[in-house]
Structure formats: C-alpha cells, structure tokens
Design a protein with these regions (language model features):
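Flexible "arm" and connector segments at domain edges
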Residues: 1-65, 71-278
C-alpha cells in the first residue's frame, strides 16, 4: 500500500516525500534511474524558463516555473540523500549559514557588526567574505572561480567586474569604445589581407576568432562600465530583430510574394525600412 497522504494543499515536506517515493524500488521506472548527469540539461532549461516568466511579468508562469525548478533541486538532493552525502535540510542549513555570514551588517553583533550603508559597501564586503570563506588567497583565484559553464557573455562580464573590484584600472566608456574601434579596424585589415591570401582557411579562422573574442570581451567591460546587463541588451535586440523579420515577411506574404523569391538587396531594403521605423 502506498504510504502517502493525499491533501488539498501540499508543502515542501510533501515534495521531498514524493521524490523519495518516485525514486524507490516500486516507484517510477524513469525517475528511479536518473542521475545528476542525465537531468543536468533539465535543470538548465528550468532556470531559463523561470527567467522567461520574469521577463513576461507573469506571476502565474513564474509560480509554475519556480515549482519546476524546485523539483529539480529536490531531485538532485534526493540522489545525494540516497548516497548518504547530504539531504535537503543540509542544503537549507548551508544557505542559511552563508546568508548570515555574508550579511554581518544585518546579523552581526558586537565587534562582528559591520557598517555597510550603500550597495557598493555591501558588495565589497560580500566579495571579501566570499574570498575568505572559499580560501581564495589571490584575486586571480576569484576570477578562476567564475564557473566555466556560464554563458560566455555572462562569464565575461563577471570576470570584468571582479577584476575591477580587485583594483584593475577602470577605463572610461570612451576609452573602451576607442579600443573596440581599433580592434574592428584591425579585423577589417586582416579580412582584406586574407581575401588576397591563399593560405589555410583554418589559420584565418583562428586569427578572426581571436580578435572577435577580444572585441566581445571589451564589450563585456563596456557593459560593466555603463552598468548595463549584456544578456538583457542582446535579448532585447534579438527579439527586436525577430519582430522586424516577422513584419517584413507578413508584408511580403500580403503582397502575394515569398521571402525566398526576393533578392538579397530587396530583402535588405525591406528589412532596413521596417527596423528603422521601430
């Protein structure tokens, strides 16, 4: 007989019990054979779907997606519980301990009370405590600790921010833009030379990739200086491009045409006309 109490409303303990049942010998054939690796992508997808709920300003969608993300946390925790490494209470305890330790301006008492009246002071404090708790002896280690699994744009911006907090000279936006313009000029020069050169394509690819990477990294630094979120900026522009593309295609279809029947020049003119008016 199934040892589970059906209710009109459930809580976190019920979720943990459901996961335990699903992973048990008589549980779900799919759930009980999953590993951290097999559901790793699911975890990433749920994080992005939570972000979509935020971007759409939809409380209902956000509630659902946060639930799906919580399921992933419970799933991974149950796997570790079965292996005797840690359980959900351990996870909650660790994050509570971390929050208390990293907020001495709120939870500190006596000599442990630290003054932090501004956002910058809080972040500076947070970084110092994080560095100490992770036994990072050098600033380079703080840069290396930014996960390599992060999207490249996000990782680049985080590295730039941490380098700046370590005392790296803060360039002005104008200096950063000038550097980007110089690199674009160098890229243009290389492409011109490559069009005349009969050398290996792989060599040209490596050269272009290197300088494009440097340009993108400098854009990460520019985002930091301007206090801009590169992910949001690129998402906005990508969405704007799709909207413009749809408008162009809809207009062509109304005229009885088709995108694949237009020349490149005709399509570019139509696209530029739409996007300039947005």
């Amino acid at each position: 007989m199934l040892d589970f109490e059906f209710k009109s409303r459930y809580g976190i303990d019920d979720l943990l019990k459901i996961m335990k049942i699903l992973r048990s010998e008589n549980g779900c054939p799919w759930d009980k054979v999953q590993t951290h690796e097999s559901i790793r992508t699911d975890l990433i997808e749920e994080c992005y779907e939570v972000c979509e709920g935020i971007d759409k300003n939809s409380p209902e969608m956000l509630k659902e997606e946060l639930g799906d993300l919580l399921l992933q946390i419970a799933f991974h925790t149950q796997i570790e519980t079965e292996q005797g490494n840690f359980n959900f209470e351990d996870v909650c305890n660790d994050i509570c301990q971390k929050l208390i330790y990293r907020h001495p301006h709120v939870f500190g008492e006596g000599e442990k009370k630290i003054k932090a009246d501004t956002e910058d002071e809080v972040l500076k404090n947070w970084d110092a405590l994080k560095k100490a708790s992770k036994q990072q002896n050098t600033y380079t280690e703080t840069l290396e600790s930014v996960p390599k699994t992060f999207p490249a744009l996000l990782r680049g911006e985080k590295v730039c921010k941490r380098a700046a907090r370590a005392g790296l000279p803060i360039n002005s936006a104008e200096d950063c833009i000038k550097k980007i313009q110089e690199q674009l000029g160098e890229l243009s020069r290389r492409i011109s030379l490559q069009s005349e050169d009969k050398g290996e394509l792989s060599e040209h690819f490596a050269q272009n990739q290197q300088i494009l990477g440097e340009i993108l990294f400098d854009f990460c630094n520019l985002n930091r200086i301007l206090k801009n979120d590169g992910e949001k900026a690129l998402t906005y522009s990508t969405n704007r491009f799709i909207m413009a593309f749809r408008a162009v295609e809809d207009d062509i279809i109304k005229q009885g045409g088709s995108l694949d029947k237009l020349s490149g020049d005709e399509l570019n003119r139509a696209f530029n006309k739409v996007i300039s008016g947005m």
